[in-house]
Amino acid sequence: MLLGRRLAAMTELLKSVDYEVFGTVQGVCFRMYTEGEAKKRGLVGWVKNTSKGTVTGQVQGPEEKVDAMKSWLSKVGSPSSRIDRADFSNEKTISKLEYSDFSIRY
């Protein structure tokens, strides 16, 4: 049973996607909540504020977890945020993770 799970994990597709979230997403702890949600899901990557009032970043991990995080970024966010839309780009399958954890960039 354990061996089967380990084999499944080894063959699991890894995905990478860049994102930008628009709306009231700065000054509402959006980056902190994004970091917490990504870590809870076992994802790696980064998040940061932009000069144009959006939040941008990259997330990597197993395909279904990345897809769930995309949904969270599009619909949930931090409690005080108001998400107008989330744009996703450069979505691709990767052979290995490029980061060791998820971090807030400044």
From Swiss-Prot:
Keyword Phosphoprotein carried by entry: yes
SUPFAM superfamilies (UniProt xref): Acylphosphatase/BLUF domain-like
Top-rank lineage group of the source organism: Eukaryota
PROSITE patterns in UniProt: ACYLPHOSPHATASE_1, ACYLPHOSPHATASE_2, ACYLPHOSPHATASE_3
Catalysed transformations (reactions): an acyl phosphate + H2O = a carboxylate + phosphate + H(+)
Phosphoserine: residues carrying this PTM: 100
Positions of the Acylphosphatase-like domain: 16-106
Disulfide bonds: none
Active site per UniProt: 31, 49
Protein name as annotated: Acylphosphatase-2
Organism: Mus musculus (Mouse)
Source species taxonomy: Eukaryota, Metazoa, Chordata, Craniata, Vertebrata
Gene: Acyp2
